[in-house]
């Protein structure tokens, strides 16, 4: 445990950031999985789930959670599934 006040604050701040980043990444993965399962099942709401998944991927890329090239790769893969 750090003794310096600024280091203590930094530990708190990084823990909060880690929690937010993990939550955002998990939300992205969940949206992608929901879309893939809907495509496999032939559900009616595929378009809405596709838009939600792409939005989650874009948000993760914007916040720096994933690289922009990975975001583009994921979106292309999802669009191929949607067709």
Curated annotation (Swiss-Prot):
Keywords: Ribonucleoprotein, Ribosomal protein, RNA-binding, rRNA-binding. HAMAP family: Ribosomal_bS20. GO terms for cellular component: cytosol; small ribosomal subunit. This is Small ribosomal subunit protein bS20. Belongs to the bacterial ribosomal protein bS20 family. One of its GO terms (molecular function) is small ribosomal subunit rRNA binding. GO terms for biological process: translation. The gene is rpsT. Binds directly to 16S ribosomal RNA.
């Amino acid at each position: 445990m750090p003794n310096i006040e600024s280091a203590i604050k930094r530990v708190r701040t990084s823990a909060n950031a880690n929690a937010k980043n993990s939550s955002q990444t998990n939300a992205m993965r969940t949206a992608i999985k929901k879309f893939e399962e809907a495509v496999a099942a032939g559900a009616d709401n595929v378009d809405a789930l596709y838009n939600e998944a792409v939005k989650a991927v874009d948000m993760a890329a914007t916040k720096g959670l994933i690289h922009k090239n990975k975001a583009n790769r994921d979106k292309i893969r999802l669009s191929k599934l949607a067709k």
